[in-house]
Amino acid sequence: SVDKGYACGLLLENGGNLRVLEGHRAEKIILDQEGGLLVNGTTSAVVVDEGGELLVYPGGEACNCEINQGGVFMLAGKASDTLLAGGTMNNLGGEDSDTIVENGSIYRLGTDGIQLYSSGKTQNLSVNVGGRAEVHAGTLENAVIQGGTVILLSPTSADENFVVEEDRAPVELTGSVALLDGASMIIGYGADLQQSTITVQQGGVLILDGSTVKGDSVTFNIGNINLNGGKLWLITDAATQVQLKVKRLRGEGAICLQTSAKEISPDFINVKGEVTGDIHVEITDASRQTLCNALKLQP
């Protein structure tokens, strides 16, 4: 029904669209083949099925929406409690919180494939088995990754074809991030990690990718790392000096350094910051064949 700025219980398909104006509200809407919901007001309990599209403009808000396989959610306003159960969500300079990504779905922060939006932000992101999250620009604050993959792209590797909002494309990770069993996080060189605390549990993998850096030295800067049986990979090209700067590194686990350097010196890797616990260093070549292992990191 639609009455006096309020819509409820509609099925939109076959090119049918509904625009929710500022101050108006829509709830319990189903979007199917080529059905669209355009939101400048507020909406809730929207289900987006294959071929459907939900668009929330600046000033608009959406909550408790479900994006299924083949569905698309484009966000430039605000969203909360979104379930990506197989579809795609692009945050284009908006803000979302408590988003769940799973079952083959893809979440992207900061891009629509054409422009980078540095003002976007996601908070309390959950990436479960089969889910994938990509941060092209903007801020990721607090995340739990369980069986899924999160990629923070290097802000220095933006394609020339992108239009960059405000002539910059910062990528920032803040708050608490937990990598559980089967989870992986890949972070491109240059992303701002200073205000983050990353915990890597048994079976979890954190990768800091410095392979784009040319020259003899690479420095990785990060806030706090807790290794609870997990692994930290440092990827370099041909650098002969690698430094990991941390506020605090503690726990039990391994730091694995992958390099193409032909010569490995005893001081090849240096860790600067507070170090506690039982942490070992392994060094491998580009094919991950061990060059040196079982070196205990000295506090």
Language-model-derived ranges and their functions:
Residues 14-17, 40, 64, 68, ...:
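Detector for Asparagine
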Residues 3, 21, 40, 47-49, ...:
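N-terminal non-cleavable signal-anchor helices
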Residues 7-12, 18-20, 26-31, 37-39, ...:
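Fold-core signature of tandem repeat domains
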Residues 99, 146, 151-297:
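Extracellular beta-strand/loop-rich repeat segments of large surface/secreted proteins
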Residues 1-2, 18-22, 35-39, 54-58, ...:
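Short, solvent-exposed secondary-structure boundary motifs
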Residues 24, 60, 277-279:
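Generic short alpha-helical hydrophobic face used as a protein-protein interaction/packing hotspot
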Residues 109-111, 229:
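A short, compositionally biased
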